Amino acid sequence: MTKLAVVGATGLVGTKMLETLNRKNIPFDELVLFSSARSAGQEVEFQGKTYTVQELTDARASEHFDYVLMSAGGGTSEHFAPLFEKAGAIVIDNSSQWRMAEDIDLIVPEVNEPTFTRGIIANPNCSTIQSVVPLKVLQDAYGLKRVAYTTYQAVSGSGMKGKKDLAEGINGKAPEAYPHPIYNNVLPRSEEHTSELQS
């Protein structure tokens, strides 16, 4: 019996995860949807059933799940992914938390296979995923010495708050997700900056 959890199920990426699970008809026997306390109690329709979104707690993360899809931010992932892992789950995390960790696989399925040195798998951000798939083809065919790559990220990368800032910024409302108005603007960040000024 396959038990699957989606963490951040009411967020922008979490809802897309559910859409993809449905569209690809991914098999599982039990589904549990988690969110923050703020969104707990919401109801989500999925494959003809109504699921009540539950608050993610240490106790719930210590239950056995086979697979956990996480998209709830780096802090949530840092705290809860190891708990899910310790309880036996394979955790696929969409946050930036584990991307630079040496003992965590950073996976794009079309490019590399997981080694499963740990039960946590990180995925790169969206622009990296889209670039490495064709770059892998070029690398295999011709070899690459260097790639210079610049991206401009959508506000949706900041989740619902980022989209809200853009929509409400048109009318001059002060931003919540960004330090400056994003409407008619470009900001050099997509998340919080690290000490190396990466985001």
Annotate each predicted stretch with a short phrase.
Residues 1-182:
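N-terminal Rossmann-like NAD(P) cofactor-binding subdomain of oxidoreductases
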Residues 95-96, 187, 198:
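Anionic group-transfer/hydrolysis microenvironments
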Residues 182-191:
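Short glycine-/aliphatic-rich beta-strand segments at the starts of folded cytosolic domains
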Residues 192-199:
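Conserved small/polar residues in nucleotide/adenosyl-binding loops
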